[in-house]
Amino acid sequence: MALPLLEYKPTTQNQRVQSFGTADVNEDTPYIYRLENANSPSEIEELIWAAYRQVFNEQEILKFNRQIGLETQLKNRSITVKDFIRGLAKSERFYQLVVTPNNNYRLVEMSLKRLLGRSPYNEEEKIAWSIQIASKGWGGFVDALIDSTEYEQAFGDNTVPYQRKRLTTDRPFSFTPRYGADYRDRAGIVRPGRMSNWNNSANQNYDGVAILGVLLAISAGMTFLFVLNWLGISSSF
């Protein structure tokens, strides 16, 4: 049984404040792709790739991640941009690349950025949506976001989601890594603490080898002198 979405208090973010047209002339404001403005095959291709950049991220736009069936339906206008975004987010490739390596809290953060164009309001919202993932599954969570009133008011049926009212000092959402620090730890990537410990042990090993080399050199020198001394005594007889 799916649990209802817990209540949370939205905080003030840029996309909730009227811009008075200032954001429209800001060079960092993203170009808004709308299906009704795509009147040529090249313009539809640009819209499709904008959707891939938004959902899959800049670093994950690879040929084998393409969803040709969804692209064809969109080009034929048999589905809306909203349906195309939904299909990309629920595709097997997206699940393997993004969903599998992450926990529910990071999935909520990434999904709000990629599908709703904003960051989470607070930890309460992240907890509320993470419960939806646990109770409805990934597909149900995606449907809940895309069918939400916020998505409808922000993008409607035929607008590609975008980062709403980004400041020049903000990192673009399209460059957000697909996995967090916990995945890097599980993947076995060496952390700084472990690297320093390894360096310390390595330095200790190098010191031991150096000392052993010096002792061997001294021993060899003493042996050589002993042999020379013995040969000198033997020749005197």
Swiss-Prot record:
The keyword Protein transport does not apply. It is a single-pass membrane protein. Its main location: membrane. Keywords: Antenna complex, Membrane, Photosynthesis, Phycobilisome, Thylakoid, Transmembrane, Transmembrane helix. GO terms for cellular component: phycobilisome; plasma membrane-derived thylakoid membrane. Pfam families: PBS_linker_poly (PF00427). It comes from the Bacteria. Disulfide bonds: none annotated. The keyword Transmembrane helix applies. GO terms for biological process: photosynthesis. InterPro entries: PBS_linker_dom, PBS_linker_sf, Phycobilisome. It is found in: Cellular thylakoid membrane. The chain crosses the membrane at residues 208-228. Residues 11-191 form the PBS-linker domain. Rod linker protein, associated with phycocyanin (PC). Linker polypeptides determine the state of aggregation and the location of the disk-shaped phycobiliprotein units within the phycobilisome (PBS) and modulate their spectroscopic properties in order to mediate a directed and optimal energy transfer. Forms a supercomplex with tetrameric photosystem I (PSI) and PC that allows efficient energy transfer from PC to PSI. This protein seems to be in the middle of the PC hexameric rod and may anchor the PC rods at the periphery of PSI tetramers. Belongs to the phycobilisome linker protein family. Part of a specialized phycobilisome (PBS), a structure that is usually composed of two distinct substructures: a core complex and a number of rods radiating from the core. This protein is part of a core-less PBS rod (called CpcL-PBS). In vegetative cells associated substoichiometrically with photosystem I and phycobiliproteins phycocyanin as well as phycoerythrocyanin in the thylakoid membrane, not found in conventional, hemidiscoidal phycobilisomes. This is Photosystem I-associated linker protein CpcL.
